Amino acid sequence: MKIEIFIIIVCAVVLAIVLLLLAIAVLSEKVAFGSRYEKNPFLKYFTADDFNLSAQPVTLEKGLKGFIYSKDDIPQKNKLIIFCHGMGPGHIAYTTEIAYFCNFGFPVLAVDSRGCNFSEGKNLKGMYSGVQTAIAAIDFAKEKGYNDINLVGHSWGAYSALCASAKRKVNKVVAISAPISPSITMAEGAVNMGALPRPLVAVIRPFWWMVNFFKYGANGNSSSAKCAKKSGTPTLLIHGDKDKVVTLKKSAFNRAKGQHLTKFLAEGKAHNPYNTENAETQLAVLSEKLKKNEYTDIMQFDFKAATEEDEEVMQKILNFIEG
């Protein structure tokens, strides 16, 4: 009788621990993906007008919305770039990069993922929503007659681009600062933010995997590194060796293998290696001001300097797509 009681107590304790870990996984996923991402009213976001771009609005399936950007006074190439944005208020945070490509004659299709800025949706739902957006953008582009389709993505967008390339045939992929998978991303984010200690994160990781499986099925835990290998698509992986958001060790840059992959390590760069070192420094200063709610200083912040392009990195991207 005592043994039976002991077994019941042990089982009850184990069940309680499992339920607690699952609850932490669900709640942390909700914090990351359970709300919409809109523009911060205290920040400046560059628009098409700032760069004299034409912006044709488009609506895709399930309320996904975006624009096809181009430069009217420049001959248009037959190659289309689909830009996949990172976490935040959608592609409007990348207008400087979009304008850069347009200045070289590329039309650029940029679509906000579910729950971001222009697109519908009460929340982001999860990481795989970005992949679904990239796939929808590819299908839309093909319906419009574009045959030479190239994906360029940053951070979450890089993950989306790599995973989408395993689902749809595209010409080339450029993945900048790409994370590997949802569970690894959640784990690293929790540690970097100081929310959870690494030993606890290691225990919770399987539960993040479970949450994403329930959300999206087998696709929910897609590995960008495995997708990059599977697709066989010529791919340029770019990563900064100082990246603390997606560390080099836990990146697709480090894990992905294949002769069709080209890798460029941006030395001295953090999470936005397409920007100059000064721009990244300025962004770090801005981030600290946001944390301290120093909004008066933010209104006088030099946003142009904080989005300055690194010509070497951007040219590598252009040369890769055109090559």
Name each model feature, range by range:
Residues 87-100, 113, 249:
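The serine-hydrolase catalytic nucleophile loop
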Residues 98-120:
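Conserved alpha/beta-hydrolase
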Residues 244-250, 274:
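Conserved alpha/beta-hydrolase "acid-adjacent" motif
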